[in-house]
Amino acid sequence: MKQRNSAILSYGRTIRKATANDVSLIMDFIRQGRAKMIAAGNVNQWSDKHPSRQTIEKDIAQGTSYLLCENDTPIATFALLAGPEPTYSYIEGGRWLDDQPYYVIHRVASVEGVHGVVSDIIAYCLSLTSTIRIDTHADNYPMQAVLKRSGFNYCGIIYLEDGSQRQAYQLSL
């Protein structure tokens, strides 16, 4: 992935690829993220088994796992994968904005008490691509609000491999 232009992140924040040494830290971010979702009433999006350590290790091995750092200290994680995303091939109740090549953001999680994480992740991703797709659970109201504020368009419902529904969004510049 070649950077198209510089990402403008919040002051003191940078993005770096995750390494095998970061797995435990990322799993801690995921535990904190799961707890935040449950506290906000979203008990269904991430089960105790998802995302798994194996998934995170695979993301790292494939070079798709990233850390958002503040003053060189990791504060959040996400995966950025080149499309096509297999579960995005069928969309119900709507349609994708276009058929252009895209990247997908998955597995966003952060430490407790930090703000602007998703906005910084989106800014970074837009330095690499002009089209981003993302999905989230219907009960994940905070993520839906951030996506709408960031200019994403709701496109419809997609189904994960296990049959779970997710709301699908796309941003195309």
Predicted feature locations:
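Conserved GNAT-fold acetyl-CoA-binding loop/helix
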Residues: 35-54
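Conserved active-site alpha-helix within GNAT-family acetyltransferase domains
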Residues: 139-156
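Conserved acyl-donor/pantetheine-binding loop and adjacent beta-alpha core of acyl/acetyltransferases
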Residues: 79-113
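Conserved GNAT acetyl-CoA-binding A-motif
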Residues: 128-139
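Conserved catalytic-core motifs of GNAT/GCN5-like acyltransferases
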Residues: 135, 153-167
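A short beta-loop-alpha structural element at the N-terminal edge
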Residues: 13-28
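Conserved beta-strand in the GNAT
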Residues: 67, 73-83
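Conserved acetyl-CoA-binding loop-helix of GNAT-fold acetyltransferases
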Residues: 110-127, 145-149
